[in-house]
């Protein structure tokens, strides 16, 4: 009798567990294992690749309902690295990123559409160089699951996008430097139910710090 009476309880627990798994889960972007790569034509000779670091970010992902997903990322523009101090200074300087005036780029998704088994399109708004414009990112879900030793649950994504730098007010050297910039994203994020809250706290703290610094001048 005891054996049979345990079946409804077990079934109920299984249903509860299934419902919990179906909900969107929040992840904190791993800034060490995530990168933003950018490339533009250099006078027709080559397309050098540079790297930008992600300062902070979080994402929400539901493998059963991609439409409920969301991504918010801040990119550290002063971190731009093309492997040469001169190039780095030029790219982060006033003629291009102007990182001293605009230290971060901000991307926030507004819609996520599944296009294939592991592929999708991310529509969002990118704020760069003081200009906010819509940007579309094509992405692939590489893997979602526990790490080798099971200490963390990680979600991994790769993405690509293209933008016209002149639309963001970066008009210098249009003949020597291509206006179309190709963006490649490699993202790893750790399961963290506090990811959104922690991001907001860090962003608010940074905003207050910048406001205080501006008031001192």
Walk through the language-model features, giving the residues of each.
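Bacterial N-terminal signal peptides that target proteins for export
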Residues: 1-9
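N-terminal signal peptide c-region/cleavage motif recognized by signal peptidases
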Residues: 17-19
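Low-complexity, acidic/polar, glycine-enriched regions of mature
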Residues: 21-217
